[in-house]
């Protein structure tokens, strides 16, 4: 009986997270043939290259203090890790943005496609990613797996809808990047509800 209860506690959250990821991936697969028609291979290539920065640095933007949030033993420790995660995430986002900006500025092909606005968008994307890392870890600490899964699906759906929209009006690479940026903000309010409470009562 105890083993059954323990298994259900493990499998339940695992199913919720896996289901959310599976739904998001399915949506991306379904939309993919359309996006390849709306954007040139060059647009998609440059977009992927720019977003590589998120794939590489995204998981470590918070100095792994976001992972410590999940293992917090008490409220004071939780608040300390939340603050550290947010501050380090903000600072490291700026640091990475400056370094990557130098690379982009010296790449004429990319600059012709995206323009100077990328120097504004890139730091915002990284800061939003750092914030999401912190919020997701807080939701994980609270065992709010349904919210994590739901937000992941909502972001994926919104991004794909916006990608199609900007593709139809031929915004190219900058449209793809803007759709990525905008989608990050979907669900942040829901995820941040408990963050406000924790920081208010610190």
Where are these regions (language model features)?
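Alpha-helical structural motif
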Residues: 49, 61, 78-81, 95, ...
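N-terminal membrane topogenesis motif
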Residues: 1-27, 74, 83, 115, ...
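Transmembrane-helix boundary and interhelical linker motifs in polytopic inner-membrane proteins
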Residues: 2-9, 39-41, 55-87, 134-147
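Signature of the first transmembrane helix
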Residues: 8-63, 88, 97, 101, ...
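Generic detector of short, locally flexible boundary/turn motifs and exposed helical patches
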Residues: 1-2, 9-13, 32-36, 112-115, ...
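Alpha-helical transmembrane segments and their helix-entry boundary regions
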Residues: 13, 17, 44-45, 81, ...
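Flexible, active-site-adjacent loop/turn segments at secondary-structure boundaries
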Residues: 15, 42, 63, 67-68, ...
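Hydrophobic transmembrane helix module of multi-pass membrane transport proteins
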Residues: 58, 88-202
């Amino acid at each position: 009986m105890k083993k059954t209860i323990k298994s259900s506690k493990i499998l339940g959250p695992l199913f919720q997270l896996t289901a959310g990821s599976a739904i998001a991936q399915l949506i991306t697969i379904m939309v993919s043939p359309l996006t390849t028609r709306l954007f040139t291979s060059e647009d998609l290539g440059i977009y992927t290259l720019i977003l590589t920065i998120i794939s590489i640095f995204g998981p470590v933007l918070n100095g792994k203090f976001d992972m410590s949030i999940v293992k917090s033993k008490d409220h004071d420790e939780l608040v300390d890790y939340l603050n550290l995660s947010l501050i380090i995430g903000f600072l490291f986002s700026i640091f990475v943005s400056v370094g990557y900006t130098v690379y982009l500025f010296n790449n004429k092909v990319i600059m012709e496609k995206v323009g100077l606005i990328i120097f504004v968008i890139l730091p915002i994307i990284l800061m939003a990613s750092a914030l999401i890392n912190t919020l997701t870890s807080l939701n994980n600490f609270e065992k709010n797996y349904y919210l994590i899964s739901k937000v992941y699906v909502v972001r994926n759906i919104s991004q794909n809808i916006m990608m199609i929209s900007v593709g139809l009006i031929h915004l190219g690479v900058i449209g793809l990047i803007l759709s990525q940026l905008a989608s990050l903000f979907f669900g942040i309010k829901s995820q941040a509800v408990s963050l406000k409470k924790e920081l208010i009562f610190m």
